[in-house]
Regions:
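Conserved GNAT acetyl-CoA-binding A-motif
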Residues: 78, 105-117
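Conserved beta-strand in the GNAT
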Residues: 56, 62-71, 78-84
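Conserved acetyl-CoA-binding loop-helix of GNAT-fold acetyltransferases
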Residues: 85, 91-104, 121-125
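Ligand-binding pocket scaffold of soluble enzyme catalytic domains
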Residues: 18-21, 26, 31, 56, ...
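Conserved N-terminal entry element of GNAT/NAT acetyltransferase domains
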Residues: 1-23, 140-160
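Short loop/turn motifs at secondary-structure junctions and domain boundaries
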Residues: 45-51
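Amide-forming acyltransferase catalytic core, primarily the GNAT-like/NAT-type
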Residues: 128-181
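Helix-loop element at the rim of GNAT/NAT acetyltransferase active sites that forms part
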Residues: 23-24, 31-43, 169-179
Length: 181
């Protein structure tokens, strides 16, 4: 990581240009996330842009071909996320190029990320080490079966006054405070 990351890169037959994540069209960013099967809504992506920093790769006609973000948690810790490459251009160096920009921004910080199976080789090549396995489950919430006879603890909507307790619970589980989120 001694040499600075370049501002453009030839990928396949496309010349890519780096830009800030804030400059990216939200609908193009959403389309990029959908192209890899991520269940993010446009409003989720906007929230991530407001909380984090990062980069996108654009081709000469302005199409987004990749993204990478980082999220500061205090002065010495950050998480990395939203590392996406267009399926057509995966394995051509776009993600690594964007990660070089992110890692340059994060110098001196402890970093954490969740890697998909497809991205593990990239992160390993950047000297990240596996720590634990995380399983992500997705589904549709359905009403509870009224015929269930098992006692269930009461469930209620989280309110504003619950935020401090939730942030403390999250900090204990995650290992660092994310109260700003």
């Amino acid at each position: 990581m001694d040499a600075p990351a370049s501002e453009s890169k030839l990928i396949d037959s496309f010349k890519m240009h780096v830009a800030t994540i804030e400059s990216a069209d939200l609908e193009q960013l959403h389309a990029l996330s959908v192209s890899v099967g991520w269940p993010l809504r446009s409003e989720d992506l906007q929230f991530l842009r407001e909380c984090g920093r990062g980069y996108v790769a654009r081709d000469d006609i302005g199409r987004l071909t990749g993204s990478a973000m980082w999220f500061p948690h205090g002065d010495d810790f950050a998480t990395i996320g939203m590392v996406i490459t267009s399926p057509r251009l995966q394995s051509n160096g776009t993600a690594r190029w964007l990660m070089e920009h992110v890692l340059r921004d994060c110098l001196g910080r402890n970093l954490r990320l969740n890697a998909t199976r497809a991205s593990r080789r990239l992160y390993h090549s950047l000297d990240f080490k596996p720590m634990r396995t995380i399983y992500q489950c997705q589904g549709i919430v359905r009403p509870a079966d009224s015929t269930t006879t098992t006692e269930q603890p009461p469930v209620r909507r989280l309110e504003g006054e619950d935020l401090v307790a939730v942030a403390e619970l999250d900090a204990g589980a995650f290992g660092v405070s994310r109260a700003a989120l």
